[in-house]
């Protein structure tokens, strides 16, 4: 460390500043505070200046540490964008949450929630509140939410969150907080939780949270002391009875809470009572699985025995000694299965088997075969076999029609028994010889004899045809029952025949009607003849005659209608009579021909009468023509009156008109 010594002279001394001069006549301003006391102008001062290196190092290190802290605080921890999450979604609301804000060295200005790109709300106290509930949404509608964080370091956006409100049948968003329950109403927590699990709702809560949708209770005795109930009221959470949960389960959709408030009418609650919950019901599904396994295990031995019975006859053909050993084994195994030992009881056992459709074919075959007594000779064995064969046949004949169903099931066993029967006749002789040789063996060989009788079954051939015969006999009455049905349809066909025959005379009755029109045409001829002399008279008369013929035509029509009515009445009476009578179809054809002949005769007589009537009508028409001429004269007189009136106006033409009128009068008088 180096130092410098300098001598200075005080030139001027002020209160704050002193002027010092060097030996080189340089002036230095120096604060008077640093000068020693009792210094005056002209005093010489010695000043020593030196460098402190140690202090320089300390100061440098201290500065670096401060600079590192500043970089760590403001350079490494930057503000992070918010992370938005979905807590719960219901039909009309949703609950959103976000992680705590990380601003670094920046300061928060605001936190804003945007819905579908539109500013929705400003979140108050964003450092304390990290969740918000948005209500008033539409059912089954998609929504998009996003947070905007504004800080002193800039603006940060969260990722967009897309959600969809639930349908009315989706109850996965229901969150129930359980309150106090009345023990007298016999509704437990297990019943409510079981209903919630059935509808797929969220687990039952014990404390009210922001995602709580319903508060369930039915006891309000301690309303003031229950903090959860007060909090539910403060958060506008609906307070409902437990039956509301049951109603949602029954209806399979979310139900309105209006009828389930604590002060609402309780008549609705009767329809939504909770079923009793037992532990057995909860473990019922678990108990079903081992039961099914045990049932499968019980079926396995039955299937194996059927396979052994089918395979045993083929083995006996090759090795009869092995058949005896297998017969001993099967005899010991099947002995406890067959409860009948006497052949007399075999028929009753078969009758009981017919009523049961689910009996295994292996068990049926064991029951149908009697277990013989040990040490039987050939003749005794044959006689006992025949007796046993006859008794089951009687039982089959007396059995109910339900054997048809059992017979179908035993078709598989019959096919095996037929193969066994073919081999059985060959083996019976060998079995008989073996029985004679084994008489001295004692009781140990008894199962072998029984098994040999089982393997050689002549019974199967006799049982099967009788069962088929009974089936055929049962089908025969069904065919006979259809015959009277066909006979009952025959009279129906015969009953339609008289109806067809009754229509025939009606068609024939129309013929005389056509014939009756002919005289009517003839009646019009004299009218034409009467008009001929009128045409010879003169021109003005022709006009009047044409008018009269037109007037006379309705009269002729009326007379013609009367003439037509008479033969029609006759034909109608003829046509109606045969339809009312009950006559055989053969006789009806002849009667119809007679009626047609009678009608033709009456029509011929009618023609003669019509000719007479036409003559009378001609005379009547001539008189009518004279009457019409008189009417024409009256009309002419009216014309004269009109002509006189016109004569007053036209005097020149009056004379000519009078002459014409006189001529017309003369002609009229001549007529």
Curated annotation (Swiss-Prot):
Residues 166-262 form the BRCT domain. It is a peripheral membrane protein. Its main location: Golgi. This is Chitin biosynthesis protein CHS5. It is found in: Golgi apparatus, trans-Golgi network membrane. The gene is CHS5. The modification Phosphoserine is found at residues 338, 362, 365, 383-384, 573, 579, 590. One of its GO terms (molecular function) is small GTPase binding. The lineage of its organism: Eukaryota, Fungi, Dikarya, Ascomycota, Saccharomycotina. It holds the Pfam family fn3_2. Belongs to the CHS5 family. Residues 461-486, 522-538, 627-638 have a biased composition (Acidic residues).
């Amino acid at each position: 460390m180096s130092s410098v010594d300098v001598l200075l002279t005080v030139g001027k001394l002020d209160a704050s500043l002193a002027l010092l001069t060097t030996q080189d006549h340089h002036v230095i301003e120096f604060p008077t505070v640093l000068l020693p006391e009792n210094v005056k102008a002209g005093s010489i001062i010695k000043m020593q200046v030196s460098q402190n290196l140690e202090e320089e190092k300390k100061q440098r290190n201290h500065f670096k540490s401060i600079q590192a802290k500043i970089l760590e605080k403001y350079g490494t921890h930057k503000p992070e964008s918010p992370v938005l999450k979905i807590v719960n979604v219901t039909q009309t609301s949703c609950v959103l949450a976000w992680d705590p804000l990380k601003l670094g060295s920046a300061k928060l200005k605001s936190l804003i929630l945007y819905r579908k790109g539109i500013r929705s709300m400003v979140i108050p106290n964003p450092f304390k509140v990290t969740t918000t509930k948005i209500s008033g949404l539409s059912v089954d509608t998609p929504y998009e939410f996003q947070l905007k964080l504004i800080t002193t370091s800039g603006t940060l956006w969260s990722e967009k969150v897309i959600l969809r409100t639930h349908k009315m049948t989706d109850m996965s968003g229901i969150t129930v907080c359980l309150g106090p329950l009345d023990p007298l109403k016999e509704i437990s927590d297990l019943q409510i939780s079981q209903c919630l699990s059935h509808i797929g709702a969220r687990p039952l809560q014990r404390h009210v949270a922001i995602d709580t949708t319903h508060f369930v209770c039915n006891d309000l005795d301690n309303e003031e002391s229950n903090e959860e109930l007060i909090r539910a009221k403060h958060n506008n959470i609906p307070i409902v009875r437990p039956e509301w949960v049951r109603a949602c389960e029954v209806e399979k959709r979310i139900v309105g809470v209006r009828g389930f408030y604590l002060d609402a009418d309780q008549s609705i609650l009767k329809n939504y009572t909770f079923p009793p919950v037992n532990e057995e019901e909860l473990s019922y599904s678990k108990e079903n699985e081992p039961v099914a396994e045990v049932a499968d295990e019980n079926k396995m031995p039955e299937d194996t025995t059927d396979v052994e019975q089918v395979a045993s006859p083929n083995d006996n053909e090759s090795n009869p000694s092995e058949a005896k050993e297998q017969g001993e084994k099967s005899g010991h195994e099947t002995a406890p299965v067959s409860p009948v030992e006497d052949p007399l009881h075999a028929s009753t056992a078969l009758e009981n088997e017919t009523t049961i459709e689910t009996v295994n074919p292996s068990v049926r075959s064991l029951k149908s075969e009697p277990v013989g007594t040990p040490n039987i000779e050939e003749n005794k064995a044959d006689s006992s076999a025949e007796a046993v064969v006859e008794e089951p046949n009687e039982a089959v004949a007396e059995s109910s029609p339900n054997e048809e169903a059992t017979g179908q099931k035993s078709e598989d066993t019959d096919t095996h028994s037929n193969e066994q029967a073919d081999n059985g006749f060959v083996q019976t002789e060998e079995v008989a010889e073996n029985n004679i040789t084994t008489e001295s063996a004692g009781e140990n060989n008894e199962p072998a004899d029984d098994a040999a009788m089982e393997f050689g079954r002549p019974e199967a051939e006799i049982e099967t045809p009788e069962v088929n015969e009974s089936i055929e006999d049962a089908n025969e009455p069904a065919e006979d029952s259809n015959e009277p049905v066909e006979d009952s349809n025959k009279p129906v066909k015969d009953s339609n025949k008289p109806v067809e025959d009754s229509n025939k005379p009606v068609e024939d009755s129309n013929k005389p009607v056509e014939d009756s029109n002919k005289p009517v045409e003839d009646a019009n001829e004299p009218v034409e003849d009467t008009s001929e002399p009128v045409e010879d008279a003169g021109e003005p008369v022709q006009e009047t005659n044409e008018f009269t013929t037109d007037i006379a035509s309705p009269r002729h029509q009326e007379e013609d209608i009367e003439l037509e009515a008479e033969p029609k009445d006759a034909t109608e009476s003829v046509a109606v009579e045969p339809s009312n009578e009950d006559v055989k179809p053969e006789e009806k054809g002849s009667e119809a021909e007679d009626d047609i002949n009678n009608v033709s005769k009456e029509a011929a007589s009618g023609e003669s009468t019509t000719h007479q009537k036409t003559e009378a009508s001609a005379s009547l028409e001539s008189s009518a023509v004279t009457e019409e001429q008189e009417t024409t004269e009256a009309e002419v007189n009216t014309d004269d009156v009109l002509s006189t009136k016109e004569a007053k106006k036209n005097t020149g033409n009056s004379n000519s008109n009078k002459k014409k009128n006189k001529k017309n009068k003369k002609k009229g008088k001549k007529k």
